C-alpha cells in the first residue's frame, strides 16, 4: 500500500531475551509478482548480517530527519481485519502477548469485533526480559501455563497467545474433561481453512512447505485451488 522498496522489522520475536531478530520484506520496486512482499532468505540474509557487523555503532552514524516519515497504519489494519471477521459470537477470549507488542492492538481488534477480551495481566506489558516465560514461543510446551490459568479463572471459551512480535499465534480451548487442548499450527490452519471454505471463500489456499497437506485436501473437497 505504501509502495515502499522494503519493510524492515527489528524484533526479539519468540527467541530468548538476549537475541534480536532482523527481518526484511521485499517491496514492489525490488521484486514484483509473487516475490513482492516475501521475506529475504539465504544468501541475502547472511550478506545483510555481514553489513550490520561491519557498520559502526548506531550512535556514531549521522541521521537525516529529512528522510524519515512516521506512518501509522493501525487504523487501516483494524478496519480491514474487522471486515474479515464479520459477525462475532458470544465468546470470551483470554489473550496474552507474551510480554510483546500485540496486547493493545489485539484487544482493540477483538473487542471491536464484539468479543469479550481479558488480557493475562502478568504478560500484558512489553518487557524485553520476558520474566514469566523462559522461551516466549506460544507453541512450546509450558509457554501457555499462565495464560491457561487466567483463562480458567475468568471462564474463557478460548485462549489466544501471540509471540512477542505478534507474528506467531497459538490457541487452546477447554475440553469436556476439564483439561485444555492446545492446537498445533497445522490444526489451527486446517480449522481456519475449513471455516473460510464453509463461508463461501473463493480463490486459492496456500501453506508453507513444512505444513501439513491437510489444507490441500480441504481445498480439494470444496473445489478451491491450492
What are these regions (language model features)?
Residues 20-151:
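Gly/Ser/Thr-enriched, mixed-charge loops and adjacent short helices
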Residues 43-44, 50-74, 175-226:
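Proline/glycine-rich low-complexity loops and linkers
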Amino acid at each position: 500500500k505504501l509502495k515502499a522498496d522494503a519493510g524492515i522489522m527489528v524484533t526479539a520475536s519468540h527467541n530468548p531475551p538476549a537475541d534480536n531478530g532482523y527481518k526484511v520484506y521485499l517491496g514492489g520496486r525490488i521484486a514484483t509478482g509473487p516475490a513482492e512482499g516475501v521475506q529475504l532468505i539465504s544468501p541475502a540474509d547472511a550478506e545483510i548480517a555481514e553489513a550490520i557487523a561491519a557498520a559502526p555503532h548506531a550512535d556514531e552514524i549521522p541521521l537525516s530527519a529529512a528522510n524519515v516519515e512516521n506512518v501509522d497504519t493501525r487504523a487501516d489494519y483494524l478496519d480491514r481485519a474487522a471486515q474479515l471477521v464479520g459477525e462475532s459470537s458470544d465468546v470470551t477470549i483470554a489473550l496474552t502477548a507474551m510480554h510483546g507488542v500485540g496486547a493493545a492492538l489485539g484487544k482493540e481488534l477483538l473487542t471491536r469485533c464484539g468479543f469479550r477480551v481479558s488480557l493475562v495481566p502478568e504478560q500484558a506489558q512489553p518487557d524485553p526480559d520476558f520474566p514469566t516465560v523462559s522461551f516466549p514461543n506460544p507453541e512450546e510446551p509450558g509457554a501457555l501455563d499462565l495464560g491457561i490459568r487466567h483463562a480458567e479463572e475468568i471462564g474463557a471459551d478460548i485462549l489466544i497467545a501471540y509471540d512477542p512480535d505478534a507474528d506467531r499465534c497459538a490457541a487452546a480451548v477447554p475440553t469436556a474433561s476439564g483439561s485444555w487442548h492446545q492446537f498445533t499450527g497445522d490444526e489451527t490452519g486446517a480449522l481456519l481453512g475449513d471455516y473460510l471454505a464453509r463461508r463461501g471463500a473463493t480463490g486459492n489456499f496456500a501453506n508453507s512447505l513444512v505444513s501439513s497437506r491437510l489444507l490441500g485436501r480441504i481445498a480439494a473437497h470444496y473445489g478451491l485451488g491450492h
